Amino acid sequence: METSAAAASAGGFFPSFLLLAFGTLVAAVLGVAHRLGLFYQLMHKVDKTSIRHGGESVAAVLRAHGVRFVFTLVGGHISPLLVACEKLGIRVVDTRHEVTAVFAADAVARLTGTVGVAAVTAGPGLTNTVTAVKNAQVAQSPVLLLGGAASTLLQKRGALQAIDQMSLFRPLCKFCASVRRVRDIVPTLRTAIAAAQSGTPGPVFVELPLDVLYPYFMVEKEMIPTKLPNSLMGRVVVWYLQNCLANLFVGAWEPRPEGPLPLDIPQASPQQVQRCVEILSRAKRPLLVLGSQALLPPTPANKLRAAVETLGVPCFLGGMSRGLLGRNHPLHIRQNRSAALKKADVVVLAGAVCDFRLSYGRVLNRKSSIIIVNRNRDDLLLNSDIFWKPQEAVQGDVGSFMIKLVEGLQGQMWSSDWAEELRKADQQKEQTYRDKALMPVLQHLNPVWVLQQVEETLPDNALLVVDGGDFVATAAYLVQPRGPLRWLDPGAFGTLGVGAGFALGAKLCQPEAEVWCLFGDGAFGYSLIEFDTFVRHKVPVIALVGNDAGWTQISREQVPRLGSDVACSLAYTDYHKAAMGLGAQGLILSRDNKDQVVKVLREGQQLCQDGHAVVVNILIGRTDFRDGSISV
């Protein structure tokens, strides 16, 4: 009986084992078939005669999203998409460095509220963009970076300029994808663009390999051998390559939706808004601090301005919110922010973050009631419970929140004494600036005085791009944006080199504006070559270079603290002549023509209005205006 039972058990085991093995084999075969796209190929066709290419799909999606410009430095990996964009009426603007292309896309994104687009070639082309992409991430700017790549089959096999680009950009971007089939271009780009603009905006990266962008006949020529090998293994390899080729192009030209996907923008709840209304209604000395997020869509700048004016609370404007109220608005307080924050009993941080710009929250009075609004939860609570504590923290869109807050406070009035106190302190501080403008300097021109002349010269339609350290930081105190979205600086990352790219993007998307660039001489070194770009593309901008022959923002603290100016010295370079060599117009200001400063600025303005890119090289000396402002 035992022998019979054992035999029966063994007899049942082997069929079960064979069934399991067969099932495993079938599953493996089906998995391989799925990965090779064999099932999809059964239901869809490959058009082997088509001369269309993936670049056309890229261009179609960009056009459907209202993209007007693509910034680039050309490379063979991305040529099809550039040619396709040009054919669809999207202006392709080529720069002299890839980082400039991304900075230009960043400027377009900030000024238009839509996605800005840059396209660069593989490997070094992409690595050259890293600083600009990180700057866009920190500034929360929706930039789409399109990057070329080696063919899908040649990745990780030593192809030219082939690196792991995805690992490089994942820490920098909200969304990263590598397109592996032509049919995936459209849905991938739609998803990427929606991700860039949803929630907290930021950069996204889409990798487009060579064989996804080029037409079938070109890819076939490179991928499939013309002569069929005799060996079995050789024939298997050819079959595999033919299948890979088919999977790349199967269903490539079937109609697909190309337009924008819905955006996910967080909103404050009615209960949160009501609690904030109650807090602010009890304030005696309220203060509003607006940051860049306040200018994000969907709330237009004019509606936000009307809301701030209706609210009637004194405010400080930072980042992209600079200029929201125009010049000399009675509610806009420009000086002594730390002192004002210490005195306020209720502070609304609307898009402002408690990072180094607000001394990590230490400038806030612990007895004040703090309302903070931000789309990003990390920014919302940054350094809270260390140096400050919010009474109400609202994760939501800042502009929409401000509209609802004002609606809830209709009829609320505050004593004019508080605003008048802040304005008086403002006026006293600005008088000290006027006094410093009259102080002599050892050589050349007083930069404070020069910037005062610039402030008086700027037209109402000026759009300011600022790129530098000491000269630009001084300008931030003295030069006022003429309106909303009329001031472009790098943002919290403090990146040097944004100037040319920002100016390029700004002038193209706002051609009616006069784009004035304020450069430090150190920062100008990054942008000089792009005057070739301005000339070639007929983009007239005017650059004012505060030339004090050094990295003065660093030296003003390094020298007294460490006793050396090592690596801080530059030369009084003839930047205006270098620009002239690139086809731009060049002017110079120094002590020799001090009495003609305004005249020369007007001359540069007229040249710019006549269609020229202009560099005004302003030789300046050094003052104690920013002593103590160590840059770490």
Swiss-Prot record:
UniProt superkingdom: Eukaryota
Chemical reaction(s) catalysed: 2-hydroxyoctadecanoyl-CoA = heptadecanal + formyl-CoA; (2R)-hydroxyhexadecanoyl-CoA = pentadecanal + formyl-CoA
Modified residue annotations for Phosphoserine: 369
Gene Ontology terms: cellular component: endoplasmic reticulum membrane
Cofactor: Mg(2+); thiamine diphosphate
Residues binding thiamine diphosphate, per UniProt: 98
Cell location: Endoplasmic reticulum membrane
Spans traversing the lipid bilayer: 13-33
PROSITE patterns per UniProt: TPP_ENZYMES (PS00187)
InterPro entries in the cross-refs: DHS-like_NAD/FAD-binding_dom, THDP-binding, Thiamin_PyroP_enz_cen_dom, Thiamin_PyroP_enz_TPP-bd_dom, TPP-bd_CS, TPP_enz, TPP_enzyme_TPP-bd
Secreted found in the keyword field: no
Protein name (Swiss-Prot/TrEMBL): 2-hydroxyacyl-CoA lyase 2
Organism: Mus musculus (Mouse)
